[in-house]
Amino acid sequence: MAEKHGSLSINSENIFPIIKKWLYSDHDIFARELISNGCDAITKLKKLDVMGEYTLPDDYKAEVQVIVNPEEKTLKFIDTGLGMTADEVEEYITQIAFSGATEFLSKYKDKTTDDQIIGHFGLGFYSAFMVADEVHIDTLSYKEGAAPVHWTCDGGTEYDMQEGNKTTVGTEITLFLNDESTEFSNEYRMREIIEKYCSFMPVNIYLSKENAPQEYETIDEAELRDDDVIVERIHEDAKTEEKENDKGEKEVVEVSPAKDKVKINKRPVSLSDPEPLWMKHPNSCTDEEYKEFYRKVFMDYKEPLFWIHLNMDYPFNLKGILYFPKINTEYDSIEGTIKLYNNQVFIADNIKEVIPEFLLLLKGVIDCPDLPLNVSRSALQNDGFVKKISEYITKKVADKLTGMCKTDRESYEKYWDDISPFIKYGCIKDSKFSDKMNDYILFKNIDGKYLTLKDCIEENRKPEDETKTEETVESTEEKKEDGAKDEKEPEKTTIFYVTDEVQQSQYINMFREAKKDAVILKHNIDSAFISHLEQKDQTIQFKRIDADLTEELRGEEAADEETSKTLTEVFRDALKNDKLEVKVENLKNEKVAAMMTLSEESRRMQDMMKMYNMYGMDPSMFGGQETLVLNAKHPLVQFIADNKDSEKTPVICEELYDLAMLSHKQLSPEEMTRFVQRSNEILLMLTK
């Protein structure tokens, strides 16, 4: 072919600086684009073979080689695809590929940094100029009689094309890296990039260093493959040892048979898995394969609890695997990773515009070839197709969880402590998910039994509630007909909960003795979750176990008013707090001398203050302080009432107050110091 010198149709000097500006944080995507081009070329060649338009050689290998050369600062991408003729190079490289880059640029020019293009797909071949001063292409088409082509361009407006010397079908792209991009001639850096973007591309990808010393390995001759390069044949004689037999006689025994081995050039190891687990049918995958895939992709050696294999072909193509990771404690941060792929090519992690936000607490991969890529994040948010994908994923997750609860309740309960933060967050964020999961949310009670929300309501409903149900309905209907306005709200069913089983053990024991139940809610998300449930069903309310005294904890007789007045004055004087709230009750549990209560409204307001770092503000501004509840039946309380002028009384009051507070919340460092010192003083008093 005649040598040709040509000009690109558009001034590339204006394009490449802008491309580099937009992709400065993702400039490693050039490798993904060039490897993807090679994979596409291989796929097309294999398709031609299937169609009978080309016959692949018997020794054909579908592969992309990436070769680094740090000394020369070059990087090569070699594929065994269908190659190009001179006319095709002219068409695809200087026209179509360039117009693709131009179209790519047009999508970016009006975008802000807050509205990035998803995945940066479509730049293709011209992404090479992000890192290279000069690019060479050597290619040979599969077409009979085609001549090899050599094409060069320095990123400016002109290119040169002439006949090349490539002898095998395929394409080789050589990048002469610029000074800012020499990192990409480092073998370890390129391995990192390939593993990031191309770990699951549908062809084998090999990475090597040019002019590196040849490495070797030794294998059994039986393991020899046709493509192995034999360096040396090795015969190992049988190994023997002299041993004593049963008769005490020494004899020579063979401990290892003779072996024929071969020394071969070290086999290259593919950096990609052309058949990732998510592309297989779920019925053909074993539990061990799922676990191994999880370890490999997420570098997490704690086994996942369980997983969901997504496999849908209509109305859109979507495959993937979602894993529920094990969380060690309620204090673990829940940081999931959902990797999004397009035709086995990695796009990005955790794209919340495609994947429901609450699912990002899980770990998994989702591959959706139908997903629009060259669009902005804001466009995805309003894309009806993407919304359907999101809804489908949510439905499959809900179906898996509800199905497990119905058919394998034992496993569901076993996993609950780990999966509950995810489910609760999902219910808060997604109303449809909440509706599906409403009957399958579990609460562990103080005896370790798991209850549904319906169970909790039934256990805590007052006996008279059931008898009044029909009357309430009739009364409501009558009032509606009469146009009555000031209706009294029906009494809510209260579900009590515990946030710290150790600290609140005194309250738990009181509840057990009174045959009252409470559920354990100690995760950070539980506060928001119970608020969500209360908004959804306004006939229920949640109260912490120390929020109030229930009727079941009180005795039948009310405390003496005069005694109550005396004790209030004594405690306020002893604690030097004239605003202290004191309530005297006859508690059924005579072992409890004092306890603290704080209304649920005040607690939640204080929790909100902590959440928003509103420290230093007086909690009483937002709903009041704790109330000290004294048990009039307890001997210590009776002693204080009868001996208000004793010198021991102030010390006993202070000690009782701190003991009650310890069962309610942590003391401050200063309060704890005073408590320990006072306790020591009381012990000394006992020795005298």
Can you say where each PLM-predicted feature lies in the sequence?
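GHKL/Bergerat-fold ATPase module in large chromosome/replication-associated machines
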Residues: I117, V135-E158, N178-T182, Y188-K688
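GHKL (Bergerat-fold) ATPase N-terminal catalytic module, capturing the glycine-rich phosphate-binding loop
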Residues: M1-D179, E183-S185, E192, S199, ...
